[in-house]
Structures are given as C-alpha cells and as structure tokens.
Amino acid sequence: YGGPLTVDDLPIDQHQFIALVAPRPIFISGGEYIEGNGVPGTNSRYSLENWQDTPGTFMATAGASPVWKLLGRKPLANKALGLSFDNVPDPVAVKARMPSPLTPLIDGDIAFRQHDQGHVDAPNWPTFIEFAGHYFKSPGFKN
C-alpha cells in the first residue's frame, strides 16, 4: 500500500454509485454556488456551501442516466427543453448542457434539479414531491 488509502484510491466514480439504484426512481438535487467570504485557509472566493460540487453532481447524474435506458426505463430528461441524457455522455458536453438553476429535469426515472440557495434541501422539496407524484398515487401528491 505504501500509505493510508484515500478517496483517490477507489476504483469507481460517483456515476457508478448512482447507477446501482437503477431501475428504481431517484431524485438528485443540489444548490448553486454562492459567493461568500471564502473557504478558511484557501484563496477560494466561494463559501463552504460550494463543497457539494453541483456541476460534478450533475455530471455524475447524467453519466448514470444511460443505465436507466438500458433497463427499459426513462433517462434523465426535460421534454420541454429537449434535454435527454440517454447515451454514454462525454463529460465536457454534459457540463455544457447543464441546465440553469431552478430547471427541473424530472421527465425520466432519474431526476435532477439545482436550486439557487446554497447547501440546503428545502428549495427542492416541491420539485421532489412533483417527481414522487409520478410514482405514488395518493391524495398528497399531484398526479
């Protein structure tokens, strides 16, 4: 080994972890980068909320999306915008196609939405409820 193992020693990437959920529905969310006082001990101008790496989260979500199609389910998509991630994506192209914050991609069985309020979940709850309503038919959900 030559030293302690780190995350860099893992022979996997996040899209592979996400793909393990397929073909079950999954909703992945994150917040937008927020300008802040910086990360202590660095020259970063972004606040601590930015450690979540929403662009990387989106790239991992899009990278896992083809597995849903392979298993006969709907890939990551927003039909109104003409966005669909049903092929093995090129990471650079995926990052370029990342939708602006507050744009839900909930037309597939794998879903993503970025809100504009940093590292919290509450702003994405209404979109999650709408996504979950595609699968749960009860009075509390819009169908």
Where are these regions (language model features)?
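Mobile cap/lid helix-loop segments that gate and shape the active-site cleft of serine hydrolases
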Residues: 1-17, 47-93
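Catalytic active-site module of serine/aspartate enzymes centered on a nucleophile-bearing elbow/loop
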Residues: 113, 123-143
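FAD-binding beta-loop-beta segment adjacent to the flavin cofactor pocket
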Residues: 17-18, 100
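Residue-level signal for secondary-structure boundary elements
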Residues: 29, 76, 140-143
